[in-house]
Amino acid sequence: MGMRMMFTVFLLVVLATTVVSFTSNRVLDPAFRRRNAAAKASDLIALNARRPECCTHPACHVSNPELCG
């Protein structure tokens, strides 16, 4: 293998390692889970606050069927 090919393989290994470690840290991190749950709750509260206008708007109604029943 030439130097260029070895360098390319090295970069691919580093990239793959970085991606795997980044995603596994996010999945296992309890603080990330709490932040994610808080963000989802905040989004749901915001959607409920605009429920009347969302249910009368066809595009919003289709995107959020759980709000309008």
From Swiss-Prot:
Residues 22-49 form a propeptide. The modification Cysteine amide is found at C68. Disulfide bonds join C54-C60, C55-C68. It comes from the Eukaryota. The keyword Cell cycle does not apply. The modification 4-hydroxyproline is found at P52, P58. Two 4-hydroxyprolines have been detected by MS but the assignment of which of the three prolines is modified is uncertain. Residues 56-58 are annotated as: Lacks the Ser-Xaa-Pro motif that is crucial for potent interaction with nAChR. Residues 1-21 form the signal peptide. It is found in: Secreted. GO terms for cellular component: extracellular region; host cell postsynaptic membrane. Pfam families: Toxin_8. Negative results: neither MrIC, Mr1.7b, nor Mr1.7a inhibit alpha-7/CHRNA7, alpha-3-beta-2/CHRNA3-CHRNB2 and alpha-3-beta-4/CHRNA3-CHRNB4 nAChRs endogenously expressed in human SH-SY5Y neuroblastoma cells. MrIC does not activate alpha-3-beta-2/CHRNA3-CHRNB2 and alpha-3-beta-4/CHRNA3-CHRNB4 endogenously expressed in human SH-SY5Y neuroblastoma cells. Mr1.7b does not activate alpha-7 endogenously expressed in human SH-SY5Y neuroblastoma cells. Belongs to the conotoxin A superfamily. This is Alpha-conotoxin Mr1.7a. It comes from Conus marmoreus.
